[in-house]
Amino acid sequence: MSGSLSRGNGGKKVLNKNQLLKRNRIRNARSIRAEAVAASSTKTGTPSDLSESGSKLNVDQFISSRQFEVKQLQLAMHNSKAASSTRIFQALPRKLRRRTASHNVRRIPKRMRNRALREMRKSDQQDVLKGSSASSRKAHGLNAKQLYKARMSIKLLRLASKSTSMKLSMPPEVTSSNCHVRQKIKTLKRMIKESSTANPNIKLLNNRMGSYDCTGVNELAPIPKGRVKYTKRQKHFAWLPTHIWNAKRSHMMKRWGYQMVWAPTQKCFKLTHRLGGDTCSSDGALCMDSSYIGTIIVKDKSNDSEGDFLKSIIGKLTAERANLRKYREGQVLFQGLIYSFNEENGEDSTKPLGPCDVFWVQKDTAIIRLHPSIYTQVFNILLQHKEKLTVQDCRYSLASVTLKGAKALESLASCLRSTEYSKSFEQFKMVSMITDHNALPQRCTFAFEAIDPRHLAAPKKLNDSQRKTVNSDDILSLHENYPQDEINAVFNELCDPESRTQSYNNQNTLKEISARRYKLLTATPNSINKTTVPFKESDDPSIPLVIIRRLKTRDWIVVLPWFWLLPLWHLLNRIPRMYHIGLRQFQQIQYENKQLYFPDDYPFTQLGYIENSFYKKEASKTKWDRKPMGKRINFEKIKDIHNTKLPAYSGEIGDFFSSDWRFLQILRNGIDYLQRNDKTLELMDSKKTGQFNAQGVRDINCVNDVLEFCKDYEAKTKAMSLSIEENIPVALCKNRKCQFRTPDSISVNSSSFSLTFFPRCIIAVSCTLLERGHPKDNARIYQVPEKDLEHWLQLAKGVYRPNGRKDHDLKIPLPEVHDLIGFITSGTYHLNCGNGMGIGFIDHHAAIRQPTRYVLIRNVGTNTYRLGEWSKISV
């Protein structure tokens, strides 16, 4: 029959449909279009390259024709290369590319493996060939190959000990007693027996995925057990649920007991600004795995349903701010500072630890979300009252995703489906069409039972029949028709370890879900939805899921059981215009929204002070030391920094690589001490003959003495190796009247070391530069001197040249060293404002004395001052 077909086609091979398509594609790709040169334009109607006489060349027309042909040649070369070469590995878009681009050849069909190996060698890609497959290995004990070797070894040992011919063939020193044959046989038998019998200590799970609830009740929970292959890597730093996915696409960092995402490998500074900034410029969303934020669930054991004892504890932790009616009864998420207290020592809530989120589920139940650096400290504080409270450590049992952007809710709605009719889910579907989240009420929380996100073959938007325009009445109904009972029921399931364990019951594997989807695809009726696996209430698990709005940071968090996060994460990142971010991008968003980022912008806390004075300082100093002598700044030889040069310091003041809050504390306390009783402030004392009094204590009579004392304290700290965690030099000012004692009352006979005993009250500010330049981290903030105020006010209005342009080359007056009032903790160019902007802290006493809100900002290692205007940031 094949012969007849060949004869009918002239002896040529009959090509199938795919071969014909490929041949036509290559033929079209290799065809090059060209413009024909016409001698006259009358016949063709097109402009000719030649003149009417035919002897001259139209240069313009000739160049345009050749330009067209060169472009067609380049296009044909590109198309021909792409059409004729078929790669085994896909050329993915940049967003989906992995960092290392390594491939496992075993996952490729056998007929393509040799070609894949050639491609990988050509492109210097890593191949995975060594190692055995884990699919054939049993759950416990030996695999089939090891079991066969053990049984064969027993038979050979028995044969060698009984066979006379084998004994004679062996050397005389090799005997059964010398080789301990019996002991080896017993050991092999024991190994086979242990492999065949099940371990009675193993707790059987309710699913085949290995998911379980890892909660510590009144104790810290252990790191969740995953694959044995990765256990050793998580000994000190636990992995988040999305670690393997993120490790291929992001730069990771190890801090605070976790391996977290620092930043994606792709450049995303402007992208983060557009999507995470204003709603008008956002056409997508950003997502971040925020499971490193630890979750504590606190319940009041007392029979009182009002939870008065829990209310008192939360009040002490948050300075009574989280106990307001809006948060406790209205179910609005509280974002603020958390404080440490110890009732035994009689300490009050004056030492802030860091930021926290508090959500009141009911009056006797609260959820506290904390940064991992302060999690253990707060957990131990709550554990002191375990007789009256039940404290659950849910660090590894509750996961969360943070979403930000105009399309955050719309993207989330395309991945989630409710198991049954839910009023909260209906409200969520209606709200998902709103891009401006500022139009929503403050109490905007959704909770419902969701199906497995893997039931959806791909993220699918809601049907047009389900979508309708949202008006003001619909938004008002969110507050009026708030389904509190329904939401409380889901929260109770989320806060119960047994309910979380039940959510993993019959959790399907990907293979099982694919088999169910294949049955749908091969079904006869076409009316059913063949891409979404239907939910079976009797067999399929349901996920208790909560979506909470955060007002301060203007984003959304999704809280769900730990092992359910990865399926949702995979589906979220398949949505167009959805990008994953890390801690670096979250800090950028906080900076652009003029919010503080923990711990970099919290120098008044213990961890923030350590971060600035140790980690960031050492990193900057190491980077500076690596530079050659000719490429690094010599901070000690910088000239013209201040108006008056004092003998105590030459060049840059304070620490060169950090915000020297200790220097600011001593300087401001010393100035207040020198100006006590309306005394005149002197920079130097020319009549002074000695530096120390009869008791060997340095006399403080002028500003130069204060600077000399700073050097003395620094030398003493290095000699005694004092801990930097103790005696934080600054404290956040809560009220207008500072609560800390000022050094105005220091007696003359007291030690000058009292200047370090009183912390300075500081306030958080955002400083926006009015002209050129942008501040950097650790930049110095100076107050505007009274004598130069007119000059800087004129500069703020603008000094123009005769041609109408601004004059930026004016000679500016320099401030004195005692005009230093603060530091910039985070500073760069603000894309939204179009100017340089920095977040920092200034001395509260100096701020309230200023007639204007203008300050001078100078970067470290420079002598250029920029005028800026500060505004207070509420903490």
Curated annotation (Swiss-Prot):
The modification Phosphothreonine is found at residue 524. Component of nuclear RNase P and RNase MRP complexes. RNase P consists of an RNA moiety and at least 9 protein subunits including POP1, POP3, POP4, POP5, POP6, POP7, POP8, RPP1 and RPR2. RNase MRP complex consists of an RNA moiety and at least 10 protein subunits including POP1, POP3, POP4, POP5, POP6, POP7, POP8, RMP1, RPP1 and SNM1, many of which are shared with the RNase P complex. It comes from Saccharomyces cerevisiae (strain ATCC 204508 / S288c). Present with 846 molecules/cell in log phase SD medium. The lineage of its organism: Eukaryota, Fungi, Dikarya, Ascomycota, Saccharomycotina. GO terms for molecular function: ribonuclease P activity; RNA binding. The keyword Hydrolase applies. It catalyses: Endonucleolytic cleavage of RNA, removing 5'-extranucleotides from tRNA precursor. Its main location: cytoplasm. GO terms for biological process: intronic box C/D snoRNA processing; maturation of 5.8S rRNA; nuclear-transcribed mRNA catabolic process, RNase MRP-dependent; rRNA processing; tRNA 5'-leader removal; tRNA processing. One of its GO terms (cellular component) is ribonuclease MRP complex. Required for processing of 5.8S rRNA (short form) at site A3 and for 5' and 3' processing of pre-tRNA. This is Ribonucleases P/MRP protein subunit POP1. Keywords: Cytoplasm, Hydrolase, Nucleus, Phosphoprotein, rRNA processing, tRNA processing. It is found in: Cytoplasm; Nucleus. Residues 1-20, 35-54, 119-140 are annotated as: Disordered. Pfam families: POP1_C, POP1_N, POPLD. Residues 39-54 have a biased composition (Polar residues). Its EC number is 3.1.26.5.
